[in-house]
Amino acid sequence: MARLCAFLMSLVVVSYWSACCLGCDLPHTHNLRNKRVFTLLAQMRRLSPVSCLKDRKYFGFPLEKVDGQQIQKAQAIPVLHELTQQILSLFTSKESSTAWDATLLDSFCNDLQQQLSGLQACLMQQVGVQESPLTQEDSLLAVREYFHRITVYLRENKHSPCAWEVVKAEVWRALSSSANLMGRLREERNES
């Protein structure tokens, strides 16, 4: 029940993502793709999460770097881009293609690729807007290290079905945090 509630809450947050909160022109379809990404990820379940409890692992998600109060709008775009790129890399790997239903996986990756394209366009618009390079690089490095730990975990567990279920749950968490960041930035923009 708690997971269903979290899923529905994430969909609500994602549905209110606004391109204006990033200060760039993301198409309206970006919001729809975000909803679809969550829906597809939920549909990709192959095993009951209960059967994989013994395989759970703490990956050290850099919450303060992705959803912390100190992250600024200019920092958000590169961090969200990196997060999306890393998720796409995980799910386009050769090992991933054997773990999931091909149709769902293709749709999921296609929607992530479209989101990545929109974020890339935002990055290009942001050229010249400088955030502290050290702060931004610190956040990007934290995201990369987090996904490196996930990749190592998958390799150590020989890309087992339970390992992929654990990773899918972790990706859900990462996507939820990015949705929370977008919601917070939107609120900040509306308040100003």
UniProtKB/Swiss-Prot annotation:
Note from the entry: There appear to be at least 12 rat interferon-alpha-1 genes. The antiviral activity of this interferon appears to be independent of glycosylation.
Subcellular location: Secreted
Keywords: Antiviral defense, Cytokine, Disulfide bond, Glycoprotein, Secreted, Signal
Name of the molecule in the record: Interferon alpha-1
Organism whose genome encodes this protein: Rattus norvegicus (Rat)
Record bears the keyword Transport: no
Cystine crosslinks: 24-122, 52-162
CDD domains: IFab
Entry keyword Secreted: yes
